[in-house]
């Protein structure tokens, strides 16, 4: 239970950062954030970002990229298998 609370707090911070980035991106036409799910509607397609508390991961999927999984590397950062942090990765997609 404690790990799910930790995940919920960290993922909420990440989702808030992603929403803030989406609001600044000229590529993002619309976005929505609702209870562990962020939807980004970009010119290149829709992106769905979902927190998976039971796995301790955040999943990003779209037709443009397929799917990417981000996990807690040291209990503080969500990274993909290449070691790239999720917010940095999203910045590239949003061209910020």
Describe the residue ranges of each PLM region.
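N-terminal intrinsically disordered, cationic/polar leader segments
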Residues: 1-96
